[in-house]
Amino acid sequence: PASLEFAYIPLSELMSGPTNFTFETGLETRLNAAEERGHQLVLRPYIDYPKLDSGLPDFLSDEVEMRAYSEHGGGFSPDYENPKLKSALFAFIEEFGQEYDGDSRIGVIQLGLLGFWGEWHTWPHEDWFPGPEFQSEILNAYVNAFNQTLLQVRYPIVDSPNLRIGFHDDSFAYSTVGDVNWYFHPTLVAAEANESWRDNPIGGEIRPELQWDIFDENINLSIEKQDFDLCVNTTH
């Protein structure tokens, strides 16, 4: 039986000004709906989701440069080095923690905010992604804001392996295990984060093109269609 639900939430639905937040309309309805079904919500705030409208809050629309791209269905990537955007992100994280740390309706908060889908990358435009210092500041802002609620980030980058943060594999059973260095489990091993599961949650999303048959008894496995149980057992 299912006990968790997942939601991507644009930052524009959670924040309407530098110190103005709209959790009541942007988050409460989702949390209450999940609770009514006996579930907890796993959520990820985002700014840039390919194919969808930008999640940049309106009050920043004239302040932050947006870079157009065509990959992944197209979209607009914000200038993450913009001081007003940085300030807004830190303000959001702080208020988010004050309002929701320890809220029993939340299962896990995936940090999101940065990169395509909130996945902490802008591939193939790697130079658009913020540098290690800002990445670390966001990671630590979340850890400082949330003392009880579980956290996850997409990759074991900068100082995340040493923080109270787990990891999520958004291509689960597609590029989870194996000898390819950018696959999920090898990146955990390389970052010495493969024991993180003992204290922090490991999760993710079954790669969309695998979802239709990954649980079939007679599935034909391949390099990019991996054994689900093996992936679960390896990553814990």
PLM feature spans:
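Catalytic-core regions of glycoside hydrolase
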Residues: 1, 35-37, 108-117, 122-236
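An active-site-proximal structural segment forming one wall of the substrate-binding cleft
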Residues: 27-41, 62-110, 133-145
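A generic structural signal for short
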Residues: 18-19, 85, 127
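Generic signature of intrinsically disordered, low-complexity segments enriched in small/polar residues
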Residues: 9-11, 24-26, 49-52, 62, ...
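N-terminal substrate-binding region of glycoside hydrolase catalytic domains
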Residues: 1-81, 202-236
